[in-house]
Amino acid sequence: MIRSFAFTTQGRLHSKDIDTFLMPTLLADTSLFLWVDLEKPTDDETRIVLADIFHFHPLSIEDCVMFSPSPKVEEYTPKEEDRFWPYLFMVIHAVDYSRKDGVFATSELNFFLGKNFLVTYHEVPLRSVQATSERCLKSTVQIARAPDRVAHTLLDSIVESYKPALDELSLEIGDLEQQALQNPTRETLNKILQVKKEVLHLRQIIGPQREVLARFARGEFKLIRAHLVPYYRDVHDSLFHISELAQAYTDSLTGILQVYLNMSSNQTGEVVKLLTMITVITTPLMMVGTWYGMNFKAMPELEARYGYEVATAATVIATAATYWYFKKKKWF
């Protein structure tokens, strides 16, 4: 699906849902800014927009249509034989966390950012793209005056989308902590390890993404106007805070795992303690039973009138004495 918008330099909507054969004409008009959004496009739509209209470099087109596990930004400057305009190609990931499945769902968003155009490409619907397009059409602050403004709004929306996911993750970690303290089971351990794996996956996404935004925050690219650099820096700072939260969650999960192992060790120790107590307390009974269970005829106690009573009394007294000694030592 292709959605397209043309805005004036004052941020007002000029036209939308533009026919592809008209896009080159609008691109040539420097008083307009063209935003083309490709959402799960067909091969023909991809070829027409990326190759035939904008003439993007084949390597960036290949990176766009193929899933890229790591965020990145690349600057393309045309040579004499090239037909494209200078542009930035960027790969960014949005995330969503499902407590039901316990996994982070990653969605890739690709940017082609030029002086008077922005092309976005994604395989699944993204709330950040939808929200930004609605803001461009309805907002009174006229954010659609230039592509670098809209790109900033998109990036800010993507980074903000991390926060609900982290809130869900925080609730999940809190539940795991309670389970580890109150009723640790094998399922609790599996859940701790799974969530820790997902947090590590999140940090692997955020790390390169921070590097990408840091380059914008430092003002490395000429296509980002100087007065917008502080806004990109603010987005980078927000992502840095999210990165710190992810590190804190990793530390929390490590602590919860240690609590689980300690609780499991304590439970095992209690079982061993109980079994040891039973074994020691019943030792006198076993000794007396074993002694008088020998099949020797010449055992005077076997013929004694009160032999049974004496053996029983000895067993009871020895068992009681053992129990009293353990109790005095506070071994149970």
List each model region and its residues.
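Peripheral, non-transmembrane regulatory/ligand-interaction domains of membrane transport proteins
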Residues: 1-227, 231-234, 238-241, 248, ...
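Hydrophobic alpha-helical transmembrane segments and their immediately adjacent juxtamembrane loops
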Residues: 237-332
